[in-house]
Amino acid sequence: SALQAVVMTGVHSAMHGSKAKPWMQRTVVSLRFQKNWKPLYGVETLQPLGHYDEASRHVWFTQERLANAADTGTTTNVGVGYRRIVANDDHYYGGNLFYDHRFRGNHGRMSVGLEYVSGIGAFRMNWYRGVSGERSLDGVMRLESVSNGYTAEYGTSFKNARWARVYMEAYRWQLRRSEDKHGLRIGTELQLTP
């Protein structure tokens, strides 16, 4: 809607304009409205711990996110990570530790991740562990729980088309009351506007 566009233009200008503080430039805010003006929003920030500049070869960082989505409700993610850039700047590697919380159902999980990025290719692996027990959805029959599992993904863009990316992801989720869910996803992402 027009109101939504005006609000987001103002937010973007304040967060990323010439007078914005460095921490604001590492923060992304999104806002949309559903029917009856019900908001969908997200705030995500990535902040270095300690000194970090263009000459730095490694960085410890925190990453926080708060979002409200139509299908999951309000969620928050809090994490810490490390990245090391090699001397010739052509690749980096790192790891992270996160806690995710979904307020609907009061569910929580921990995750540990590793990544290796070289040029146009990237490999990422994440392991997930539920830290909340089963919860009743309706007080009687339907139960819900956080599944343990992992995802492993390799993706690449193209030298002359950085706006296009293809990826392959393997996953396995351990389900409590049925067979484990596992598979392979192959997909593409296209950034059609800059």
Report residues per predicted region:
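Transmembrane beta-barrel domains of bacterial outer-membrane proteins
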Residues: 1-112, 116-141, 158-194
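Outer-membrane beta-barrel signature, preferentially recognizing the C-terminal barrel domain
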Residues: 139-150
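Intrinsically disordered, low-complexity, charge-dense segments enriched in Lys/Arg
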Residues: 151-157
